[in-house]
Amino acid sequence: MDTKAAFVFTGGGSLGAIQVGMLRALLSHGVQPDFVVGASVGALNATYFAGAPNIEGVAMLERIWCGLRRSDVFPISLASVIGLLRHPGNIADPGGLRRLIEAHLPYTKLEDAPIPLNIMATSPEGLAVRLSSGPAAEAILASTAIPVVFPPVEIDGKMLMDGAVAANTPMRLAAELGASRIIVLSTGYACALKEPPKRAIGRALHALTLMINWQLMHEVEQLSDDLDVHIVPTLCPLAVSPFDFS
């Protein structure tokens, strides 16, 4: 019986940078996936990694993260906040994130990735939606569409939002796709924060990472004992907000 391995990338805002170091460590020890699954910021990292699943690709991803600023991802202004109060919608324009994706991604369709790639998004009904073909940029934008912050993205007639809402740690999907060995690249959470982040989006992202951590533990307990599951250790103590791109 063939043994398939999957890398599962979780969400977590700017803490997604931690996954770059995890990838470097895994590859240096000869651990390679047969396919990858990602949700939220994990979808972004999974998509880049699937495009170049080697040390050189990880080095490229590291350079992207090192050059990233908060304004590149969350271009929020006073005018946008006032506009939200007057006309409820979303706070940030996803244009910056789209430009980031299109400037660095070496392919345009998910099915063109060198290794199989699966992106998770959430439907309006709260169901997990798997994206494995079609425009890569749209899939990433859908999976990272944090409610209120970014607008939902229409794909195949459905308005989709952040994959972390329904399936932030999609280990069950990895198992359904045939993985018997699952390596989870979790972003962790700011376990050493003494008080919540001051900015509203920072607080929302911090709450999301706390939810992700508990969701991860719960999902592990529900998986079959026949699966070989490894969760890459996260950083703790950690006092960096998932909204901090410094």
What are these regions (language model features)?
Residues 23, 136, 176, 198-201:
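Short, solvent-exposed amphipathic alpha-helical segments in soluble enzyme
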